[in-house]
Amino acid sequence: MIKLSTVQLAQILQAKLIGDENVQVEKINTDTRKSVSNSLFFALKGEKFDAHQYLDQAVSQGALALVVQQENSSISVPQLVVKDTRIALGELAKWLREKINPRTVAMTGSSGKTTVKEMTASILQHTAADSEAVLFTNGNFNNDIGVPLTLLRLTEKHRFAVIELGANHQNEINYTTKLVQPNAALINNIAPAHLEGFGSLAGVVQAKGEIYRGLTKNGVAIINAEHNHLDIWQKEISNHAIQYFNGKDYSAKNIHHTSQGSTFTLISPQGEIEITLPYLGEHNVKNALAATALAMNVGATLTDVKAGLEQRSQVKGRLFPIQVTPNLLLLDDTYNANKDSLCAAIDVLKGYDAFRILCVGDMKELGENSLAIHREVGQYINLVNLDLVCSYGNESAVISEAVSGKHFTDKTEMVDFLVPLIENQLQQNKKVVVLGKGSRSMKMEDVIYSLKDKIKC
């Protein structure tokens, strides 16, 4: 953040200022468990927490000023009193985005948005010829708190911002996209994910479409031609220009998949170029097209795209390859899962000439359709004919049932079952590939990294 005085902050937030007008801050904090020293502390309040209980702690740890909803007479540092500290956090983030005014892109989708974010940021780092000139979302900071905190990291050095928007209920993206004000916005795909919050696939379509409401006046709406719901999104897109990836504007041909990634010819409005992509799977070729569309709409060239896509390294938890031995490959795709992303990962696994093992955990937040969706995955696995499926969790049991696999209620038991089986395959000089996949709460990486540590062949 740039340096601001408490009187400037009061004006931006339309807050009542109590205390010194000239205290200067350039750091934001919302959590006393992290470094609060020399920061402006926002006392956020939610259904299950209230940071107003920790004001004394924030001050004792070095907070220079506080943003609060109620004045506290015992506090010695300046207080900025607002009606809602969460909204105030967003207002400050919006003000800073407008002040710095970087070329900004935003993406959402049911899966792949983090990979698209990483790819886009990599491309734009080449456009800027400076990795420090590109701000991008860290981790899962993609909700109504994380997005403002991301924007509040903006400084005058930033020329580009790449912001990921997530949601598990209606109107969440409607709020965050209006803070971000993207010059280009993209929906990567639509799938049955977070159905407990959205209610139905139609609810997902509507919620993701909210991203286009925040577009700047000349902003571009980018749509996946394979997930085109323009009839529903037309109101949000209004008079904005529309481009398509996996379609007429950005596409791929001559696609070849290898154990290290993919090669393809990228087709774009700027022309064609050969890409060697260090990401596994057909779906990541599509993610690369999405990233290209976003980056080109804020100034990237074909040369930037090639450099950015080819130099980006794999990300743990997202089809991250772990070559344990020449004959044993573990695929860590454990960050999260929905039906489409799971089937995409299975497509990668089926392409290996090896003994192919799927270790799958439950897909969460699917509501009343959860068991049916898990069964559909089992039916899909039957079509691709994997060698072994091991499941863990309550609902993934139906996947094992559908494919005559093995179900476990304990991950340690799964590992203990797999270790001798895999070692036996390796002793016969056979290749083995193990894919781990499941929703974040299932922590299927426990299985993958235990196998890495325990297999001795």
From Swiss-Prot:
Record carries keyword Thylakoid: no
Regions annotated as coiled coil: none
E.C. number: 6.3.2.10
GO biological process: cell division; cell wall organization; peptidoglycan biosynthetic process; regulation of cell shape
InterPro entries reported in the protein's UniProt record: Mur-like_cat_sf, Mur_ligase_C, Mur_ligase_C_dom_sf, Mur_ligase_cen, MurCDEF_CellWall_CoF430Synth, MurE/MurF_N, UDP-N-AcMur_synth
Keyword terms: ATP-binding, Cell cycle, Cell division, Cell shape, Cell wall biogenesis/degradation, Cytoplasm, Ligase, Nucleotide-binding, Peptidoglycan synthesis
GO cellular component, one term: cytoplasm
Subcellular location per the Swiss-Prot or TrEMBL entry: Cytoplasm
UniProt GO MF annotations: ATP binding; UDP-N-acetylmuramoyl-tripeptide-D-alanyl-D-alanine ligase activity; UDP-N-acetylmuramoylalanyl-D-glutamyl-2,6-diaminopimelate-D-alanyl-D-alanine ligase activity
Cell wall biogenesis/degradation listed as a keyword: yes
Similarity-based family: Belongs to the MurCDEF family. MurF subfamily.
Record function comment: Involved in cell wall formation. Catalyzes the final step in the synthesis of UDP-N-acetylmuramoyl-pentapeptide, the precursor of murein.
HAMAP family: MurF (MF_02019)
Protein name per Swiss-Prot or TrEMBL: UDP-N-acetylmuramoyl-tripeptide--D-alanyl-D-alanine ligase
Species lineage: Bacteria, Pseudomonadati, Pseudomonadota, Gammaproteobacteria, Pasteurellales
